[in-house]
Amino acid sequence: GHFHNPELLGVRKIIRKTHFHNLDLIPSNLRLYNLEYEIAGHMARNQNMEIIDLIAQAIDEVVDDYDVVIMDPPPALGMVSMAVLQAANSMVIPVPPSLVDFASTVSFIDMTRTTMKQLEQLAGRGRPAYNFIRLVGSRVDESKSMHREILSMMRQVFGGSMTQSVMVTS
């Protein structure tokens, strides 16, 4: 199908310039939202996992035009997120300093590990080799003692994978 050809996907056509110098983006849209269902449908019909490489193929088409390509998939392990995980060479996972978000992130990492192993078995492929995986505190208000305590706990649990720098609440 047309999913395997990034030219037909038209990745160059959907890249938009921003008012920031040398920062382009592909805005989320209904077509990307529908991609979740299209990928699942394609996999069910064709009984193969090649479609999971769709995003990697699209990025390969334009990767030489950029220093860094940042992908921001939904925080769920759907087909689009799996395709992003396959296409990525590094990960930065934002974690707000709340117990619910911390627990959610631990669960997400465990589910991702399991899902990637299943994908490896189903597709007969190796897991992606990431240059790095880092967790970063996000929406942090360092004047709140609870935020400081939870960040400290996250650093103990995640060790060197947790950045010292945080993204503060703005």
Please report, for each region that a protein language model flagged, where it lies by residue.
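P-loop NTP-binding core
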Residues: 1-170
